[in-house]
Amino acid sequence: MAMAFCPKDQYWDSSRKSCVSCALTCSQRSQRTCTDFCKFINCRKEQGRYYDHLLGACVSCDSTCTQHPQQCAHFCEKRPRSQANLQPELGRPQAGEVEVRSDNSGRHQGSEHGPGLRLSSDQLTLYCTLGVCLCAIFCCFLVALASFLRRRGEPLPSQPAGPRGSQANSPHAHRPVTEACDEVTASPQPVETCSFCFPERSSPTQESAPRSLGIHGFAGTAAPQPCMRATVGGLGVLRASTGDARPAT
């Protein structure tokens, strides 16, 4: 006969080839089967204890009376109120001590972190000030650069604009050099006449002529003109080359 599945409170006996109750073997010291069941049976026999299947151990009901399971209901209900209230009262000072400790730790932490917060605010103020200074320096640099570029684009005041305009507007500005030379050569020549020259008595006289431009275009210079000498009745007469000489009287 094959081995059959037995319930939790029984085990399979190979000699009998049947399921046998574990209660018969729990009293034996050398029992190897039904260990969990035997622990459960023995825990139920003890008052104020219950068997926890998750832990696989016997747990006292005193530690779970506030949140006790159903197995400990009869024990926690019969428990004296003085003992039931004693544990919460003992626990309250501990909670108070924990609160005091937490408050003290919070104060200590606050005292420790207080200067850190102040230091961070000072650092923030310092960084803001430095940022404003850097912005001001950058703006000044941009203004200086703009003024430099503006001055660079303006013409240099080496030559005044007035003479340029007057030279450009003058009628002789665009005339070629040949025309100017023609004007110089075409200007009226000074006239010199010699009349009644008496070489044996006095030097010939020179009439005043208007000051005009010479050969080279300088004022006050007179171009010399050759005179032709003629004898009229024993008198020497000089004639100008221009043909404006007057005969002697």
UniProtKB/Swiss-Prot annotation:
SUPFAM superfamilies: TNF receptor-like (SSF57586). It is a single-pass type III membrane protein. InterPro entries: TACI_Cys-rich-dom, TNFR_13B. Keywords: Adaptive immunity, Disulfide bond, Immunity, Membrane, Receptor, Repeat, Signal-anchor, Transmembrane, Transmembrane helix. It is found in: Membrane. One of its GO terms (cellular component) is plasma membrane. Residues 86-116, 156-176 are annotated as: Disordered. Binds TRAF2, TRAF5 and TRAF6. Binds the NH2-terminal domain of CAMLG with its C-terminus. This is Tumor necrosis factor receptor superfamily member 13B. It comes from Mus musculus.
